[in-house]
């Protein structure tokens, strides 16, 4: 729904509640047609394993009517399992991240894996400390170790809405924090935030 709302340029809240304007239906139809023909494959298998994922990707790549998979996005890492008995969740996540790295090399395809953060980042006290750090990655330090890049998305306005005494902030701005970059520098990149369509964008485009 979020992809369709963003592609159609329709307010995400109106999309969810069905409060659409007459012209929105035309935009929605065009976006639906465009996405229907897009080489995007979604799989909502719960508790999927690396082995199952590789098998599904190979089936797509072997289909002559489809383009090969060029990017894998996992939403999110903690929903995956190894399919084997492990002593604890930390070891299981470590095994998953290690095998994802191996799979990326074997299949020559980049992988973007979303991850939960620990609740500690929500409990920070001052205005700046809500910004996530590598130590906030949930369940395992192997995420930091195995990843080539670690990016955090952050919005001041998210925390300002929870703390009315925190002062005014720009609701249309966000940050992409490059916390790890194996092949380059770490930095913080300013972004625009389009809340109506639930998407981040280049600052210049937002203006």
Question: What are the language-model segments listed below?
Answer:
Residues 1-68, 82, 188-190:
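Cytosolic-facing regulatory segments adjacent to core modules
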Residues 20, 25-27, 33, 38, ...:
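Sparse, context-dependent recognition of short Cys/His-centered cofactor- or disulfide-binding micro-motifs
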Residues 45-175, 196-207:
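P-loop NTPase motor core
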Residues 175-179, 192:
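C-terminal helical "lid" of AAA+/P-loop NTPase domains
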Residues 187-199:
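A short, surface-exposed beta-strand/turn
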């Amino acid at each position: 729904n979020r992809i369709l709302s963003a592609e159609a340029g329709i307010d995400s809240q109106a999309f969810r509640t069905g409060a659409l304007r007459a012209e929105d239906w035309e935009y929605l139809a065009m976006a639906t047609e465009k996405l229907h023909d897009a080489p995007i494959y979604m799989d909502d298998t719960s508790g999927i394993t690396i082995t199952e994922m590789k098998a599904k990707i190979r089936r797509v790549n072997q289909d002559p009517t489809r383009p090969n998979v060029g990017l894998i996005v996992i939403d999110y890492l903690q929903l995956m399992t190894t399919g084997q008995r492990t002593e604890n969740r930390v070891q299981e996540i470590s095994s998953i991240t290690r095998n994802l790295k191996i799979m990326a090399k074997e299949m020559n395809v980049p992988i973007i894996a979303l991850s939960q953060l620990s609740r500690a980042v929500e409990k920070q006290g001052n205005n700046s400390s809500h910004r996530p750090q590598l130590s906030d990655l949930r369940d395992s330090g192997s995420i930091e170790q195995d990843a080539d890049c670690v990016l955090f998305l952050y919005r001041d306005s998210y925390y300002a809405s929870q703390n009315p005494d925190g002062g005014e902030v720009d609701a249309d701005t966000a940050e992409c924090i490059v916390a790890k970059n194996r092949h380059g520098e770490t930095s913080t990149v300013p972004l625009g935030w389009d809340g109506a369509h639930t998407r981040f964008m280049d600052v210049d485009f937002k203006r």
